[in-house]
Every structure is written in structure tokens, then in C-alpha cells.
């Protein structure tokens, strides 16, 4: 497995379970060894480094992933980078199958005039900063008093919320490191505009994200009443999908809250004075980042109309907003893997009709035996963490089917000495961090957090992680 995030860990667990259940029938036996390679010094990928720190459900997911890794048939190799420390040829010589679960770590480019101005930031880089990504920035410019966030999904909501958060409140409830706490303490943002191209019924927010937006201390929510004038067809269409219906209902609840905040004299959700304003603009498509002296000075937005079918129509009506920083959360681009064809159009590793079998070309091409992809590496950056489970089951089913055929035709000759990979890494001077090493890092984070009355306090420097893990 390449990648120890949710996709890689879920796939490992499901593979072992399905093998135990079906292995004898398929002629494969019921036992396997899974080696899980991760380029970072610690596991969990998106769960640790891609989700806002104030999501309480995330620690439960991390706990479940950790239980899976605490399995004698799964061997964790953190701090080992595919393409640098080990190659595809190295792995194919030692394993019956290789599964890529490499996720997505880069921002999709913002293709707007002015996107290269100083003060335009991709959400992925900002998330890296506040989540303490090992190779991410340690400081972040937060001097802008007026800020714009572009995007209609959960990542945009995360970014906007963190920009409006109170530093002390965030520290008390999360594992943020000192540098992030100090950065947010100095945050000058007073006004934030969230721009969503389509309408209320087409947004992609989870209900949980919306409820977290509602309860920001010291923040007044401001919403345009006109955005909530939905026609009968749109209401009917939204009602067909349970999650969409729940989201729209929650947005109407937020609209009522915003009205109350305004009527009560610019207060937050608890009726306390609000010193920050959070504007939510639906049917608003940014068309240009405005600049002055090479820096962001504003953003131009075109009003749109969205039909019941979700199609957006531009109106030709524009409005400029004065802002000094723009964050774009318009999607991620999954990581490329050396030696594997990348599908630029689909933004994922090339695989056969989405079944996870790696192919030689993005469109069609031949299936490359023993190579697979799962999660965002397979389908592109869509779906929540839970979506990777259904992905994993499909990929594992295909893997077992292919392995069974390989047994019938004479199994591929590979080096199955379990210590072979250890010797190779040692020869190259690579010192992997195993599960026991991760537990040492985790224990230190818990002890440091306890000193401040917190459950965890995240270690951010990779050298410190290595020192702790190898002690």
C-alpha cells in the first residue's frame, strides 16, 4: 500500500477481512502480509493533515484507523517516499500487488485574472499551515482585515471558519501547535465574504459544517434574502435527495438566525456583541482579482442565476468588493506517482473505467497487472472520508479476483522474504518509522497536551518526530 491515509488503511483492513472470508474458496489462503508505505513521518494523511482541527468527529476516525494499524499482519513504513526511497520496480519484485492510496495534496489552479497577485492563497496550503503539515509553512500572513473565500464545499467552509475563529477558543478545543495559535492570535480579519457560484440548493456543504458556521463566537452572519427565493421546481428537485434536503433546511435555519442577529443589533448566535462579520453570497461567481502595486485590493463578482437542474447562467451584473486577501477552495489535485500514468482530465491516476486497475493510458490503454489505485488517487478529489470505504471494498474485490487468476496461471515470481524490503531500505540509509514509533510520537503529543489541559498538542517538525519515534 502506498499511502497511510484513510484510503490506504481502510483498504488494508478490508483486504485482510475479505481474504479471511473468501481466501480458501479462491485458492489464496486466508493470510497475507501488508506493508504500508507513507512518505510523512506519521500516518493518517487527510485525517491528520487535511481536515480542520475543530472537527470533533475526526479524532474518532483517527482512533479507528489506529486500531486497524495495530495488527500484526500490517507493517507500517512511515518516512519512506515512493519514487525516492523505493521505486515501482523495487515493489513489484517483492509484492504480489501494489495499491496506490496517495490522496490529493495540491490545489487546483485558480484560472482568474489577478490570481498571481500577492495575497491570493490556495486552500490546501492554508490547511497545511493550520494542521501543522511537516513540510508546510510555519508562519502565515493574516494582516488582511477584509478577506474573500471562493468555493461552495466543505473545504471553503473550513477555511472561512478558521479565519473567523477566536484563537483561545480554538486552542482550548483542538490540538493546534503553538505557531498556529500565535498566528491566529494576530489575525486581523474583521470582514469575510464567502462566494458560492451556484444557488442555495446546489451548494455542497455538509449539515455539520453549517452548524459549525452558526456557532462562531463574536461573529455576525449576514445572508442575502434574495438568494433564498427558490422556485417550486428547485424545491422539488432538492427534496429528492435526503442530504440535499437536510442541507437546504439547515441553510434556511441559518437565514433566520442571521435575521435575528441583525435585528438584535449586530450580535453573534448567543446574542453577544459581534466584532467580526461573515457574509455568505450565493449565486456569486468571482471573475477577477483586483490588484494595486502587485497586491490584492479587491474582487469582482458576477451575479448568477441557477435553475432547478443546477445549471448556472451569468447575468452580466457585476459588483466589486474591497478585500486584501483571497482564498480559493475550488478543489484538490491528486498527487502523481512516478511510473504511473496520470489522467489530467479526470485528475486521478489512470485506471480502467474507475475500477481501480491501473492502465497504461488515461483514456483506455492496457491494464497493468498487479497495480491498483483507490480513494482520491482512483476517482479524483470527490467524496468525504467515509466514501473511501466503499471504494476500498470494490478495489479489494478486484484485487482478489486478479490474484486468484494469477494462482491458476502460475503465481508471479516475487521475493516473499519479509525482511527483503528492510534490507533494501537499510542499504539506502532509509530509517522507516513503524507503528511503535508512531505510538511514541502520539504519547508525546498527549503528554504535551495534558500540560495545557488538552487531549493532544501536535508536533509539527519532522526532525522532532523522527527523534521521538526512533528513541
Feature annotation, model-predicted:
Residues 19-36, 47, 157, 161-313, ...:
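Dinucleotide-binding/catalytic capping subdomain of oxidoreductase cores
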Residues 119-137, 289, 295, 307-379:
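FAD-site-proximal beta/loop scaffold in flavoenzymes
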Residues 26, 31-33, 40-97, 254-272:
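N-terminal Rossmann-like dinucleotide/flavin-binding domain of flavoprotein oxidoreductases
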Residues 14, 62-120, 279, 287-300:
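Feature captures the FAD/FMN-dependent oxidoreductase FAD-binding
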Residues 3-5, 152-153:
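Glycine-rich Rossmann-fold phosphate-binding loop(s) that bind the pyrophosphate
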Residues 359-362, 366-471:
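C-terminal, flexible cofactor-proximal segment of oxidoreductases
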Residues 94-103, 148-150, 321-331:
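Short hydrophobic core segments
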Residues 107-186, 349-362:
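Glycine-rich dinucleotide-binding loop and its adjacent helix/turn
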Amino acid at each position: 500500500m502506498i499511502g497511510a491515509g484513510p484510503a490506504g488503511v481502510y483498504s488494508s483492513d478490508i483486504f485482510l477481512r475479505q481474504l479471511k472470508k473468501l481466501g480458501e474458496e479462491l485458492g489464496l489462503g486466508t493470510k497475507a502480509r501488508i506493508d504500508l508505505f507513507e512518505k510523512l513521518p506519521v500516518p493518517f494523511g487527510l485525517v491528520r493533515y487535511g481536515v480542520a482541527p475543530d472537527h470533533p468527529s475526526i479524532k474518532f476516525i483517527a482512533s479507528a484507523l489506529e486500531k486497524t494499524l495495530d495488527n500484526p499482519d500490517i507493517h507500517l513504513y512511515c518516512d519512506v517516499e515512493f519514487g525516492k526511497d523505493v521505486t515501482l520496480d523495487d515493489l513489484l519484485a517483492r509484492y504480489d500487488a501494489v495499491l496506490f492510496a496517495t490522496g490529493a495534496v495540491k490545489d487546483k489552479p485558480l484560472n482568474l485574472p489577478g490570481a498571481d497577485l500577492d495575497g491570493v492563497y490556495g486552500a490546501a496550503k492554508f490547511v497545511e499551515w493550520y494542521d501543522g503539515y511537516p513540510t508546510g509553512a510555519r508562519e502565515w500572513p493574516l494582516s488582511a482585515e477584509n478577506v474573500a473565500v471562493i468555493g461552495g464545499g466543505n473545504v471553503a467552509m473550513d477555511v472561512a471558519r478558521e479565519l473567523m475563529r477566536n484563537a483561545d477558543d480554538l486552542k482550548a478545543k483542538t490540538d493546534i501547535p503553538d505557531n498556529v495559535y500565535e498566528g491566529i492570535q494576530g489575525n486581523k480579519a474583521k470582514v469575510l465574504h464567502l462566494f458560492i457560484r451556484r444557488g442555495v440548493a446546489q451548494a455542497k456543504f455538509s449539515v455539520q459544517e453549517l452548524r459549525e458556521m452558526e456557532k462562531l463566537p463574536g461573529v455576525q452572519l449576514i445572508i442575502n434574502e434574495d438568494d433564498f427565493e427558490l422556485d417550486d421546481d428547485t424545491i422539488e428537485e432538492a427534496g429528492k435527495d435526503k442530504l440535499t434536503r437536510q442541507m437546504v433546511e439547515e441553510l434556511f435555519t441559518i437565514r433566520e438566525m442571521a435575521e435575528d442577529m441583525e435585528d438584535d443589533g449586530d450580535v453573534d448566535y448567543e446574542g453577544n456583541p459581534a466584532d467580526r462579520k461573515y457574509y455568505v453570497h450565493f449565486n456569486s461567481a468571482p471573475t477577477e482579482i483586483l490588484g494595486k502595486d502587485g497586491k490584492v485590493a479587491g474582487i469582482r463578482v458576477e451575479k448568477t442565476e441557477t435553475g432547478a437542474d443546477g445549471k448556472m447562467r451569468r447575468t452580466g451584473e457585476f459588483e466589486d468588493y474591497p478585500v486584501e486577501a483571497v482564498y480559493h477552495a475550488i478543489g484538490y489535485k491528486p498527487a502523481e506517482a512516478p511510473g504511473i500514468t496520470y489522467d489530467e482530465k479526470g485528475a486521478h491516476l489512470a485506471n480502467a473505467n474507475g475500477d481501480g486497475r491501473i492502465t497504461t493510458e488515461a483514456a483506455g490503454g492496457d491494464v497493468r497487472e498487479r497495480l491498483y489505485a483507490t480513494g482520491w488517487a482512483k476517482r479524483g478529489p470527490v467524496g468525504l472520508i467515509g466514501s473511501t470505504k466503499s471504494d476500498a471494498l470494490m478495489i479489494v474485490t478486484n484485487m482478489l479476483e486478479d490474484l486468484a487468476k494469477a494462482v491458476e496461471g502460475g503465481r508471479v515470481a516475487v521475493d516473499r522474504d519479509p525482511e527483503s524490503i528492510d534490507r533494501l531500505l537499510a542499504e539506502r540509509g532509509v530509517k522507516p518509522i513503524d507503528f511503535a514509533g508512531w505510538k511514541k510520537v502520539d504519547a508525546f503529543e498527549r503528554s504535551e497536551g495534558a500540560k495545557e489541559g488538552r487531549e493532544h498538542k501536535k508536533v509539527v517538525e519532522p526532525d522532532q518526530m523522527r527523534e521521538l519515534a526512533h528513541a
